[in-house]
Amino acid sequence: MNLIKLLTNEWQEMTEKLLKCELIDLNEYKDLCRRTHNIVHNFSDKDTVPKEICNLILELQWFSWWIADAEWTPMHGLYQELGNVITALQCHFFSLDEKYDDIEPFLDCL
């Protein structure tokens, strides 16, 4: 569970960067998405989900909300793509659509 808490903290840091209008390193972001996807994938078919995973998904939601609020920025197109990756992670977790099982096509759009 320590890995999940670490990922949650990293997403909090990403959110703080957004709030400060700092640039986001795409390679760092893609790596974080891949690591998150691997963790989420391990729990997507489970009947019970650890609280830490719920907190991680909640942090992803906060990040995506701040991206949505960033529409006025010159990087809006990028933020929209970042939001699509977050949506893919969340949909995969909740098993809403099999097309979200592979996150790479979404990362390739960045």
Predicted regions, residues:
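Short terminal alpha-helical segments
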Residues: 1-33
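Charged, amphipathic alpha-helical oligomerization/scaffolding segments
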Residues: 6, 31, 35-38, 59, ...
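Secondary-structure edge/capping motif, primarily at the C-terminal ends of alpha-helices
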Residues: 14-22, 43, 67-71
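Charged, low-complexity interaction regions
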Residues: 23-25, 45-48, 72-76
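Short, charged, amphipathic alpha-helical segments
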Residues: 30, 50-56, 80
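Amphipathic alpha-helical core segments of compact helical bundles
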Residues: 37, 41, 62-65
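Short, solvent-exposed, charged loop/turn and helix-capping segments
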Residues: 39-52
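Amphipathic alpha-helical binding modules
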Residues: 60-110
